[in-house]
């Protein structure tokens, strides 16, 4: 499958860009590998910082970042990629990033699915509240299909939130 997490980034970036372009057809949508640079420095270096007034506080290292440029503002989208099963620690990492920057979309994906603890927490015990990072916004968790190069919709948590 993937020998390294980094190998997931190009197909994930292409998929995420397609999804966001479908949702914002008139906006400029780009996806970036931001895994090795702080998001604050990245936005400033790309000249996108003016779209995000709080960008200086974004000292976070998200694997894939999408920028949706609207007329005078912008939206962020995050995807964290995991080669192994998604753990509670992984969820916590993305939850922290999302609470800092408040992206419009925040997704964590892995071709290996989720750990048993995550499955129990979210599916068996229905604790979807732990995914919330802002009012009306919560993380999405999904299995990445490496052959189709997109998420597997039946695995999406919370179910039905593919919007």
Regions found by a protein language model. Give the residues of each.
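Nucleic-acid nuclease catalytic cores
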Residues: 85-90, 99-137, 141-146
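Intrinsically disordered, low-complexity terminal regions enriched in charged/polar residues
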Residues: 3, 10-14, 126-163
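Alpha-helix termini
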Residues: 19-25, 68-72, 126-133
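Well-ordered alpha-helical segments embedded in enzymatic catalytic cores
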Residues: 63, 90-93
């Amino acid at each position: 499958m993937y020998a390294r997490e980094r190998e997931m980034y190009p197909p994930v970036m292409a998929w995420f860009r397609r999804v966001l372009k479908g949702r914002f057809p008139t906006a400029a949508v780009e996806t970036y590998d931001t895994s090795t640079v702080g998001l604050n420095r990245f936005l400033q270096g790309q000249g996108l910082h003016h779209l995000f007034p709080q960008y200086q506080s974004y000292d976070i290292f998200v694997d894939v970042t999408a920028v949706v440029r609207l007329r005078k503002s912008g939206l962020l989208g995050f995807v964290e990629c995991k080669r192994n099963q998604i753990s509670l620690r992984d969820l916590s990492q993305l939850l922290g990033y999302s609470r800092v920057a408040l992206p419009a979309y925040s997704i964590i994906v892995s071709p290996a699915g989720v750990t048993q603890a995550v499955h129990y927490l979210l599916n068996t015990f229905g604790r979807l509240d732990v995914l919330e990072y802002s009012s009306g916004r919560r993380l999405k968790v999904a299995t990445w299909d490496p052959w189709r190069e997109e998420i597997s919709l039946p695995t999406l948590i919370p179910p039905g939130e593919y919007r």
